Design a protein with these regions (language model features):
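Hydrophobic structural segments
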Residues: 1-265
Length: 265
């Protein structure tokens, strides 16, 4: 199947118009006229992922994170972005990314995470433009739910970090896959007992937790960014297989979390 026809199908699943203003998803590398028979799905485009695409005979990588997330001002092979781009191009591997335009769709990244964690009765948290999903679980202690989350997600160095009383009982959970501290003020005003997201910074998390301790607001759970978004790959694979029968879709086996180990103190 021609890449340009695949892109048309991708855009029907993940409309480019739904991306955040700052985001740059879409075709990163490749030519629309090239033939694609096998697609590798991944969270990131790293050297290992490109090598996996080559070894599995994949002509296209569909990643969640754009290959040039922070922009690129040169692609010399002395730098990792240039070296990775050159490796992919030399082996005829194209790269396409679906980022924020995939986050908030039905079956998208955040919904996939909420479903994986066992949340039911999913709705959009008001005031967050549908970015944060609210759901319910049978009443459970914060500690036991954190343990459940740890079992549901792939193992990573950071584990599952939690701020709150371990014995607190929770039933309403707000979720945002990826970096979510910009939504802390909105979640604080909600009926959630717990907010699960990634990349929480020291000061926003500290202020939120102190306020919650006074007001009875939500507890916090910080899960690894890669682990939170990895669960979407199986959902994306199923959607693509239902839409496109002529192409084989496989999920990457590479863990692209940047951290390799932690020393517990």
């Amino acid at each position: 199947m021609l890449l340009e026809k695949l892109i048309s199908q991708f855009d029907s699943l993940w409309p480019p118009a739904d991306k955040e203003e700052w985001d740059k998803p879409g075709l990163m590398l490749g030519t629309p006229a090239q033939e694609v028979r096998k697609v590798l799905l991944s969270v990131d485009v790293t050297r290992e992922v490109i090598e996996e695409a080559i070894s599995t005979g994949s002509q296209l990588i569909v990643s969640h994170h754009p290959m040039f997330m922070r922009g690129a001002f040169e692609l010399a092979e002395t730098g990792i972005k240039g070296a990775n781009a050159a490796l992919a191009i030399r082996h005829g591997v194209a790269v396409f990314s679906a980022h924020t335009n995939a986050d908030f769709q039905t079956g998208g990244v955040t919904q996939s995470l909420a479903t994986k964690l066992g949340l039911t009765k999913l709705t959009a948290l008001e005031s967050t433009s549908s970015h944060v999903v609210m759901g319910e679980v049978d009443e459970v202690s914060l500690l036991d739910f954190a343990r459940l989350v740890g079992k549901k997600l792939p193992a990573v160095a950071q584990g599952v970090k939690v701020a709150g009383d371990p014995s607190r009982m929770i039933s309403k959970v707000a979720v945002l896959a990826g970096s979510g501290d910009s939504y802390l003020p909105m979640v604080a005003q909600s009926s959630a007992d717990l907010y699960i997201t990634s990349d929480l910074r020291h000061h926003p998390a500290q202020d939120f937790s102190e306020q919650s301790a006074i007001t009875g607001g939500p507890a916090l759970m910080d899960i690894a960014h890669w682990a939170a978004e990895w669960v979407w790959l199986d959902s994306a694979k199923a959607q693509l297989e239902n839409l496109i029968a002529q192409v084989e879709f496989v999920v990457s086996e590479i863990n692209t979390d940047p951290w390799t180990f932690a020393v517990m103190q």
